[in-house]
Each structure stands twice: as C-alpha cells, then as structure tokens.
Amino acid sequence: MKNKEHYEKLERMYLNARFNTKIYDTTECSIEHEKAEIGLTISDKYFHALGAIHGSVYFKLLDDAAFFAVNSIVTDVFVLTTSFNINLIRPANQGKIKAVGKVKFKSRNLFVAESILYNEEGKEIAFGTGNFAKSKVHLSEEIGYL
C-alpha cells in the first residue's frame, strides 16, 4: 500500500468515528508523513461556564493530532496514547481552531509526538506532548480503516 492510501484510510477512520460524527461534527483532518492536522469550528456546545471551550476539547484535538502523526508511520496496527501532557495558554470562543501534530521521536516500541493548537488568527493557544505505543489491534475494515 502506498503512503497516500494509508493516510486517506486513517483520515476516513477518524472522520467517520461516531465520536466525531455525533459530537465533533465540524471536525477536519489531514494526515501526511509524521504530521497530522485536526481542526474544528468552535460551537457553544463545547463551552464551560465562562463562555470559552472546555479543556477537554483542547486535549482531544492535541492528542488526536499527535496520535495520527504517529499512526501515519505505523502502517500495520492502531497506536495507543500511553501518556499526554497539555499546557493551556489562552481561551478560545469563536472561529476555527487547528492542532498540528508532529513526530519527535520513534523507536521500535515507543513514539513521542508533540502538537500545537492554534486559533483562527494563527496564535498558539495550547500545546502538548504525548507518548504512544503500538497496540495489538490491526488496522482493518472492522475498525473503519477503509
């Protein structure tokens, strides 16, 4: 399989996941070698009491971007997040936000990736670093890899 086909299958798997079609329905995804971009349009359904997006949304986008940056180079199995640290810099309450994930380290069993979340003006609003490992779950049609 060519890399482009692998990236497109990962994108479809991600965008068709029930979590994204039901809750994060404006999600966009682009995957290439050791890099992934995950974005969405902010909606008030993601807001906490102070009228800005909840930290869980920051985490989701940062983790997903780093995760798919890693899975872009793992072509046989699904990877797993083993740990992830985030830093929230500023709030966001309108427009589009985009997380850009990149692989920083890779070995046979451990991967480290970082991601940065940007607001619509291109300002950094959060960043994170995660550790990832290969699972025993093969990439297949059963998990939406088509």
Predicted regions mapped to residue ranges:
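Terminal targeting signals and extreme-terminal segments of soluble enzymes
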Residues: M1-L146
